[in-house]
């Protein structure tokens, strides 16, 4: 490989070519993570609650984490979302409209001992779930 005065064109060409060997570069440029993401790259999304589900915690913990299955309004995809807070699941009923966000796991993945759950609920019918759990606000009737 040339390193002379006029070798710049070849060096740039080779760099562009070998860039594609880098897996992270290829995924970023082809936007593969965005295409696979149910939220389509957005930070938040709204959905309709289909059912309440209990997800068993991974070893060594023993618990049933309260989650919900929701169908996203924007694209119809179904996902599972975690309901954080003591008794938070009691404020969520079927057919409610919830707003979700990422749960905060590494590289957009799941968090802690909840397997396969990448999202969490933070609003129910446009009211903060945290405020409802704390008793500051009541759940509105839709």
UniProtKB/Swiss-Prot annotation:
Keywords: Ribonucleoprotein, Ribosomal protein, RNA-binding, rRNA-binding
One Gene Ontology MF term: rRNA binding
Keyword check for Transmembrane: no
GO biological process: one example: translation
InterPro entries: NA-bd_OB-fold (IPR012340), Ribosomal_uS12 (IPR006032), Ribosomal_uS12_arc (IPR022863), Ribosomal_uS12_euk/arc (IPR005680)
Keyword GTP-binding on entry: no
GO CC terms, sorted: small ribosomal subunit
UniProt record similarity statement: Belongs to the universal ribosomal protein uS12 family.
Subunit structure: Part of the 30S ribosomal subunit.
Function: With S4 and S5 plays an important role in translational accuracy. Located at the interface of the 30S and 50S subunits.
UniProt-listed HAMAP family: Ribosomal_uS12_A (MF_00403_A)
Listed name of the protein: Small ribosomal subunit protein uS12
Taxonomic source organism: Methanocella arvoryzae (strain DSM 22066 / NBRC 105507 / MRE50)
């Amino acid at each position: 490989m040339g390193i002379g005065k006029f070798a710049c064109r070849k060096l740039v060409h080779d760099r562009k070519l070998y860039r594609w060997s880098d897996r992270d570069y290829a995924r970023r440029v082809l936007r593969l993570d965005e295409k696979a993401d149910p939220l389509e790259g957005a930070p938040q999304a709204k959905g309709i609650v289909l059912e309440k589900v209990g997800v068993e915690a991974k070893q060594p913990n023993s618990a049933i984490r309260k989650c919900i299955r929701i169908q996203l309004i924007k694209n119809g995809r179904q996902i599972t979302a975690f309901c954080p807070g003591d008794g938070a699941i009691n404020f969520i009923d079927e057919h409610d409209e919830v707003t979700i966000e990422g749960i905060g796991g590494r590289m957009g993945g799941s968090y802690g001992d909840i397997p396969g759950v990448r999202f969490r609920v933070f609003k129910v019918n446009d009211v903060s779930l945290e405020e409802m759990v704390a008793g500051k606000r009541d759940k509105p009737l839709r």
